[in-house]
């Protein structure tokens, strides 16, 4: 092989590597943008089942993680049948992390996801309702109703006023009737959910969601 041919091959290999790197960087950038648009908090951008496998999943939540992964493997069927997840347990038990892992799988499959904490959801509705232009609020409520996977983080952390409870009832009822999945994380126990909200909210969540619980101390590590 002469020097010219060898150089051409080397240049081709080098360019191929560059293109591969560029494509991977674009894929990551696109994924980050999609996570942002879905409302995923920046702290959880790195959450994925792949990361759990690579870094190790704590034994205390392994069973819950396995169930979440099983759910994620059948996203299309779960979306069509309106099946969701309800993660409950004490703080720091990876409930939000696992919910985001599921969300990431859905986003990578180009399925609609919207993640929002309950306090933020209701604060947003209050703020928008004070605006004379109600179009913004209608668009927000349409997204809550119609997105394929709605993730309600910190369910039960919202202030329990009557209108708040009614709004929660309306959201759950609408998605239940239209067979839209809801994925919930909460520090409340199932019996506390039943006591906080009207009976039909609890019944609808229980009948359409895989209930996954975790008990014990927080798994979060203190900053060094």
Model segments located where?
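Loop/turn-to-beta-strand initiation segments
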Residues: 111-112, 146-150, 178-184
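Conserved catalytic network of the ASCE P-loop NTPase/AAA+ motor domain
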Residues: 77-79, 106-107, 142-145, 173-178, ...
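Short glycine-rich substrate-engagement loop in P-loop NTPases that contacts/grips substrate
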Residues: 61-68, 103-146, 159-162
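N-terminal pre-Walker A segment at the start of P-loop NTPase domains
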Residues: 50-78
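Interdomain "pre-motor" coupling segment immediately N-terminal to P-loop NTPase/helicase cores
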Residues: 1-42
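Walker A/P-loop nucleotide-binding motif
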Residues: 77-99
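Conserved adenine-nucleotide phosphate-binding loops and their immediately adjacent elements
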Residues: 40-53
């Amino acid at each position: 092989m002469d020097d010219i041919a060898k150089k051409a091959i080397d240049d081709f290999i080098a360019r191929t590597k560059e293109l591969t790197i560029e494509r991977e960087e674009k894929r990551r950038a696109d994924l980050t943008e999609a996570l942002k648009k879905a409302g995923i908090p920046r702290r959880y951008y790195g959450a994925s089942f792949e990361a759990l496998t690579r870094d190790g999943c704590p034994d205390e939540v392994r069973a819950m993680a396995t169930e979440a992964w099983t759910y994620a493997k059948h996203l299309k069927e779960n979306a069509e049948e309106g099946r969701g997840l309800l993660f409950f347990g004490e703080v720091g038990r990876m409930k939000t992390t696992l919910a985001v892992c599921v969300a990431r799988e859905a986003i990578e499959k180009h399925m609609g996801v919207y993640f929002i904490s309950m306090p933020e959801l209701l604060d947003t509705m209050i703020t928008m309702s004070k605006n004379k232009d109600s179009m913004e609020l209608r668009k927000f409520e349409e997204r809550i109703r119609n997105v394929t996977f709605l993730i309600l983080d910190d369910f039960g952390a919202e202030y329990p006023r009557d209108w708040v409870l009614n709004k929660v009832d309306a959201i759950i009822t609408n998605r239940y009737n239209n067979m839209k999945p809801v994925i919930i994380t909460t520090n409340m126990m199932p019996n506390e959910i039943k006591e906080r909200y009207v009976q039909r909210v609890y019944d609808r969540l229980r009948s359409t969601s895989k209930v996954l619980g975790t008990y014990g101390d927080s798994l979060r590590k203190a900053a060094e």
